[in-house]
Amino acid sequence: MQITLIGVHQRNTPVTVRERLAFNLYELPDALLALRRYVDEGIILSTCNRVEVCAVTRNGVAGDEALKTFLVEQRGVDQALFAPSLYVYHNEAVVRHLYRLAAGLDSMVLGEDQIVGQVKEALAIAHAAGAIGPVLHRVLHGALAAGKRARTHTGIATGHVSVVSVAIDAMRQYPDLLKRGRALVIGAGHIAELSLKHLLAGGCSAITIVNRTEARADALAQRYGVAWRPWSDLEDALAASDIVVSCTSAPGIVLSQQMVERAAAGRSTPLLLFDLAVPRDIDQGVAEIPGVYLHDVDALEPICRTNRALRAAEAERAETIIEGEVAKFMEWWAVQQAVPTIRALRKRAEDIRDAEIRRALARCPELSPQQRETVIALSTAIINKLLHEPIVALRDPEASGELLTAVRRLFNIDDTAVYTSANMT
């Protein structure tokens, strides 16, 4: 059994590639059902910075290829698109990666806590799809707990802790616009809500929300005391705005170049566009329009680098905490790796004992019921004594995979027996 994770990240994969691999929330249930055809357990984490598929598989190399094939088939892309930047982790490396991720150590914005909500959401969707089993349940809940501990005991989560807060920091280059300008938030999800909070905290009060689902726009607007307009008013709302934050889950372009050209015509002040969606909401051609300044997720990287440098010492402290939590998980994992073999070993011994007892009792029909019970009890005791030391050795967290392989070979236990035992309740 192996834990495998494949993925691409903002650090080494441009948004032009990430947006072709991304899954929106509505696609995830069906995608997870498809993933279960390849693996025993699985989860998909798709955010503006990363697309990752994590799974528990029975065969290491075959599992890697299955996950790559899954991405190719689900996204309709050639593997050559993502192969150069794809990372592949196994077992302990997966656990370390997910624990660091939940602590914000692997984020574009070091220490950001938005990833916690994204992991919880991905976990809930995977649970609902029946894709989460005992291993990923333990890994992901352990990651969330480790991330919380790292944030609680270090200063990694101080200051700018989300892509949204970094975007607001970029807006401060235009203080008059932020204080006196009109802002438009396109979308009504988690990132849209974060955007509202940060815009209001930054001094911007003239804010309008536009969203395809009017009920969600209305609810969000009432919660924060801002205005909202229906989706049909999007272009008019754009023309009336100075700052635009677009963060929908739309599969394609929301603001076309032509729409932005019309909105920018005759303006005397800059039009700031922040595209925080993946796939991107805003046509990249708008960057060529005079007076229009487009920032997508990747364009915010320079500010994030400064953020990481300032928090380097706190990040080291957080890494130490994460390593301790990873070690705890790996002790549990080592034992779990041995459990199917132990069950199969005991079943093998019991099958042999049962066959020999039946043969022996058939030869001794004169034995009384009490004597028969004594013989059966004796055989059980012998089996338990013989298996005790091997089982203790297999349960040792320090036991290697070579020991498991050796035991299977010595007792002629095939993989089918091992995985049948693994699925026993």
Swiss-Prot record:
Gene3D superfamilies: Glutamyl-tRNA reductase, N-terminal domain (3.30.460.30), NAD(P)-binding Rossmann-like Domain (3.40.50.720). NADP(+) binds at G187, A188, G189, H190, I191, A192. Substrate binds at T47, C48, N49, R50, S107, E112, D113, Q114, Q118. It catalyses: (S)-4-amino-5-oxopentanoate + tRNA(Glu) + NADP(+) = L-glutamyl-tRNA(Glu) + NADPH + H(+). Pathway: Porphyrin-containing compound metabolism; protoporphyrin-IX biosynthesis; 5-aminolevulinate from L-glutamyl-tRNA(Glu): step 1/2; Porphyrin-containing compound metabolism; chlorophyll biosynthesis. InterPro entries: 4pyrrol_synth_GluRdtase, 4pyrrol_synth_GluRdtase_dimer, 4pyrrol_synth_GluRdtase_N, GluRdtase_CS, GluRdtase_dimer_dom_sf, GluRdtase_N_sf, NAD(P)-bd_dom_sf, Shikm_DH/Glu-tRNA_Rdtase. CDD domains: NAD_bind_Glutamyl_tRNA_reduct. It is an enzyme of class 1 (oxidoreductase). It comes from the Bacteria. The active site is at C48. The record marks H97 as: Important for activity. GO terms for biological process: chlorophyll biosynthetic process; protoporphyrinogen IX biosynthetic process from glutamate. Keywords: Chlorophyll biosynthesis, NADP, Oxidoreductase, Porphyrin biosynthesis. GO terms for molecular function: glutamyl-tRNA reductase activity; NADP binding. Its EC number is 1.2.1.70. Pfam families: GlutR_dimer, GlutR_N, Shikimate_DH. Belongs to the glutamyl-tRNA reductase family. Catalyzes the NADPH-dependent reduction of glutamyl-tRNA(Glu) to glutamate 1-semialdehyde (GSA). Homodimer. Possesses an unusual extended V-shaped dimeric structure with each monomer consisting of three distinct domains arranged along a curved 'spinal' alpha-helix. The N-terminal catalytic domain specifically recognizes the glutamate moiety of the substrate. The second domain is the NADPH-binding domain, and the third C-terminal domain is responsible for dimerization. PANTHER family: GLUTAMYL-TRNA REDUCTASE (PTHR43013:SF1). During catalysis, the active site Cys acts as a nucleophile attacking the alpha-carbonyl group of tRNA-bound glutamate with the formation of a thioester intermediate between enzyme and glutamate, and the concomitant release of tRNA(Glu). The thioester intermediate is finally reduced by direct hydride transfer from NADPH, to form the product GSA. This is Glutamyl-tRNA reductase. It comes from Roseiflexus sp. (strain RS-1). The lineage of its organism: Bacteria, Bacillati, Chloroflexota, Chloroflexia, Chloroflexales.
